[in-house]
Design a protein with these regions (language model features):
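Membrane-core helix-loop-helix motifs of multi-pass transport proteins
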Residues: 132-238, 409-410, 433-467, 475
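Membrane-interfacial loop-to-helix junctions in multi-pass transporters
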Residues: 2-3, 59-63, 86-99, 126-133, ...
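Re-entrant/interfacial helical elements at transmembrane boundaries that shape
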Residues: 114-125, 151-162, 390-403, 431-443
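Alpha-helical transmembrane segments of multi-pass membrane proteins
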Residues: 92-104, 129-146, 166-179, 370-384, ...
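Hydrophobic alpha-helical transmembrane segments of multi-pass integral membrane proteins
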Residues: 90-121, 338-345, 368-400
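Short helix-coil transition sites and intra-membrane helix breaks within transmembrane domains
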Residues: 64, 76-81, 105-117, 143-150, ...
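Transmembrane helical segments that form the transport core of multi-pass membrane transport proteins
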Residues: 232, 236-383
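Hydrophobic mid-bilayer segments of alpha-helices in multi-pass membrane transport proteins
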Residues: 4-13, 20-42, 64-70, 209, ...
């Protein structure tokens, strides 16, 4: 029976492995989940209940979908500004800055692999060959749990039914541990790229990464999800900038390039941290499903993202440019938006119909507390195959709720799974193909990059699985 209950996930992952598009796999996986829930669901839901479960999942996916659309518009509006950034001299510090700071900053604020694109392009401008450039750009995805202002992490928390505030600092701790063990891999790949770090570079970047990870944990303990990673990155980026260019580099041209990002951070801070503004924007709020989160449209990060994107477009080319921007945004975002609805709907059907609970009881009866190790592996597999931490959450969160009892252990296991799924999106076929097309790399060069990244796979999956198992054993 457990294989029947698992069949929606098996079908979804199997279709992707066979080369089908994620949209087709998501559609068929959702249909399969509905049929299995109706025929063999432990809670015996009728058709109306299954439709309600899917609708509740789609409702959870709505805020994320709006951020996907608005974030893509924001990214597209700033493409030319990114292309006109000052070129850097070919040295290790410039490479590390592109891959470890600038790429993660753009990924957290916009998502969609924008940080990866910036990092791989930056590496190529420094004279790095195509294969090592693809491998090094992977490090721009180290903060994907906060990518696109954290929409994937928010969805995972909603599916699992856990407190977002309690989850995000645990995700930050797991990320900090991985940041420490992955930095030597970055140095190794840098040597292969012929931009090796000197001792001074190692000391500087070890210090900067330690500072970044400490700030990341602190920010996630005190700030909302949307602001935490940006707040951690900003002072580290400023410190690096001042060390390289000094205060003389803080000119009006730099301010003009950064203005959209500054406006975004200020808007998010006002919306989330100023009680008078937050309370005013909290209404209207909609909660059509008792077991799904409320949604306040005026508090959505999508609002400042789309407003800033339109302002930038209008300043460049008037209303015509703004209309062209929105047309292009909707063309590119449509598939991602639909896939988000399908994946969250499928996961919610599995949770609401009792499929996830039935799986948990069956597996736990055999493996006991060791079954917790399955969750980050499932997250990693979902992230790798879909290229999306929303997809990773849709695969792993139903298992987390089923296999791990509620409490501290479940939060730790979910944090490990979110990080595993997020960091495996960095080496997913979706992400790597994006870089391959951008820099016109051959299949052989792409394969060389992936072979160089085998420690990334091993460290991410190994450490997150160990954390999940330790949390379950100590509970």
């Amino acid at each position: 029976m457990v294989l029947i209950w698992l069949s929606p996930l098996i079908l979804f992952l199997g279709l992707i492995l066979s080369g089908r598009s994620a949209l087709i796999a998501g559609t068929l996986g959702t249909i399969c989940a509905a049929l299995v829930a109706y025929v063999a669901g432990p809670s015996h839901p009728d058709a109306a209940a299954i439709i309600r479960h899917f609708a509740a999942g789609a409702w959870i996916g709505l805020p994320a979908t709006l951020v996907i659309i608005a974030g893509l518009a924001f990214s597209l509006s700033l493409e030319k500004a990114s292309d006109n950034a000052d070129p850097s001299q070919p040295e290790h510090g410039a490479l590390a800055e592109a891959c470890l700071l600038r790429g993660p900053f753009l990924e957290t604020s916009t998502g969609f692999g924008v940080g990866y694109v910036v990092a791989v392009s930056g590496a190529r401008r420094l004279g790095v060959d195509k294969a090592p450039a693809l491998a090094l750009a992977t490090f721009s995805q180290i903060l994907v749990p906060w990518g696109a202002l954290g929409i994937g992490t928010r969805i995972s928390a909603d599916i699992a039914g856990v407190s977002l505030a309690a989850l995000i600092w645990r995700i930050a701790v797991v990320t900090a541990l991985l940041g420490a063990v992955l930095l030597p891999l970055f140095w190794r790949l840098s040597r292969q790229a012929k931009l090796p770090p000197a001792l001074a570079d190692r000391l500087e970047w070890a210090g900067l990464i330690v500072l970044l990870m400490a700030l990341l944990v602190a920010a996630n303990l005190t700030l909302p999800l949307e602001l935490a990673a940006i707040a951690a990155l900003a002072p580290v980026m400023l410190l690096r900038f001042l060390r390289v260019k000094g205060f003389a580099g803080l000119d009006w041209a730099l301010l003009a390039r950064l203005a959209p990002y500054i406006a975004l951070v200020v808007a998010l801070a006002l919306m989330r941290l100023v009680p008078a503004i937050h309370d005013r924007l909290e209404h209207p709020s909609f909660k059509p499903f008792a077991d799904a989160s409320a949604f306040a449209p005026l508090l959505s990060p999508a609002l400042p993202l789309i407003i800033i994107a339109l302002v930038v477009a209008i300043r460049r080319g008037g209303a015509k440019q703004a209309a062209a921007l929105m047309k292009l945004t909707l063309q590119r975002a449509g598939r991602a938006a639909l896939l988000t609805f399908l994946l969250v709907g499928m996961a919610w059907i599995m949770v609401g119909s009792g499929l996830a609970g039935g799986i948990g009881l069956s597996v736990s009866g055999v493996l006991g507390s060791w079954s917790a190790g399955i969750v980050p592996v499932a997250g990693a597999l979902g992230g790798y195959l879909t290229g999306s931490n929303t997809g990773a959450g849709a695969v792993s969160m139903p298992l987390a709720t089923a296999l791990v009892p509620a409490g501290e252990a479940r939060l730790a296991v979910i944090a490990a799974a979110v990080v595993a799924g997020s960091l495996l999106t960095a080496v997913s076929p979706v992400r790597v193909t994006m870089g391959q097309v951008l820099i016109k790399a051959t299949t052989a060069e792409t394969g060389q990059a992936l072979r160089a990244l085998w420690p990334w796979f091993a460290l991410v999956v190994g450490l997150t699985t160990a954390i999940a198992l330790a949390a379950a054993q100590l509970a």
